[in-house]
Amino acid sequence: MEAAGSPAATETGKYIASTQRPDGTWRKQRRVKEGYVPQEEVPVYENKYVKFFKSKPELPPGLSPEATAPVTPSRPEGGEPGLSKTAKRNLKRKEKRRQQQEKGEAEALSRTLDKVSLEETAQLPSAPQGSRAAPTAASDQPDSAATTEKAKKIKNLKKKLRQVEELQQRIQAGEVSQPSKEQLEKLARRRALEEELEDLELGL
């Protein structure tokens, strides 16, 4: 069945070419006015409520469609009507991949549970006093390393601020008449450097 044709221009005006009906009969060629739009091409009006409900997701946020979709038994060969061999192969491949993924997730969950149970066994109160004290000493090390890192950052920021202040004094004194792009960027970052320095000093 051919779709309704768009208006075509001729010497005598516009016309819609003849089209075939679903029952096999033909519609006659019709002349139309300038600017005529066929009924099939007129967009359907939708108010804002209809648009809102169409765009609204069917599932709650965070819930994947796979979790709610019912598991359908795989059809036998040739049981899927209207599908080509390639489409059937793709379906089989997807089904196999899904089964492998589910199996992998189950194995990962089992390994995680085993690991948790082993950790709980290792943390029983029967452990000697010395072995309990060891993790505490180890946990102090990251804190001291973080403090050292902050101190280095503070020193670095103070150095950068000192350079910015010196540059500003040189510009005000007339030593630098035309500051370069990099020098102007340094001056612009002064406030950001000061704020970062304050945050680090408060965090110590």
Swiss-Prot record:
Residues 152-204 are annotated as: eIF2A-like. Residues 86-97 have a biased composition (Basic residues). GO terms for biological process: exon-exon junction complex disassembly; nuclear-transcribed mRNA catabolic process, nonsense-mediated decay; positive regulation of translation. GO terms for molecular function: ribosome binding; RNA binding. Residues 138-147 have a biased composition (Polar residues). InterPro entries: PYM1, WIBG_mago-bd, WIBG_N_sf. It is found in: Cytoplasm; Nucleus, Nucleolus; Nucleus, Nucleoplasm. Pfam families: Mago-bind. SUPFAM superfamilies: Pym (Within the bgcn gene intron protein, WIBG), N-terminal domain. Its main location: cytoplasm. Residues 1-33 are annotated as: Required for interaction with MAGOH and RBM8A. Residues 98-118 have a biased composition (Basic and acidic residues). The modification Phosphothreonine is found at T72. The modification N-acetylmethionine is found at M1. GO terms for cellular component: cell junction; cytoplasm; cytosol; exon-exon junction complex; nucleolus; nucleoplasm. Keywords: Acetylation, Coiled coil, Cytoplasm, Nonsense-mediated mRNA decay, Nucleus, Phosphoprotein, RNA-binding, Translation regulation. Residues 82-116, 145-204 form a coiled coil. Residues 1-32, 55-151 are annotated as: Disordered. The modification Phosphoserine is found at S6, S64, S117. Interacts (via N-terminus) with MAGOH and RBM8A; the interaction is direct. Associates (eIF2A-like region) with the 40S ribosomal subunit and the 48S preinitiation complex. PANTHER family: PARTNER OF Y14 AND MAGO (PTHR22959:SF0), PYM PROTEIN (PTHR22959). Belongs to the pym family. The eIF2A-like region shares sequence similarity with eIF2A and mediates the interaction with the 40S ribosomal subunit and the 48S preinitiation complex. Key regulator of the exon junction complex (EJC), a multiprotein complex that associates immediately upstream of the exon-exon junction on mRNAs and serves as a positional landmark for the intron exon structure of genes and directs post-transcriptional processes in the cytoplasm such as mRNA export, nonsense-mediated mRNA decay (NMD) or translation. Acts as an EJC disassembly factor, allowing translation-dependent EJC removal and recycling by disrupting mature EJC from spliced mRNAs. This is Partner of Y14 and mago. The gene is PYM1.
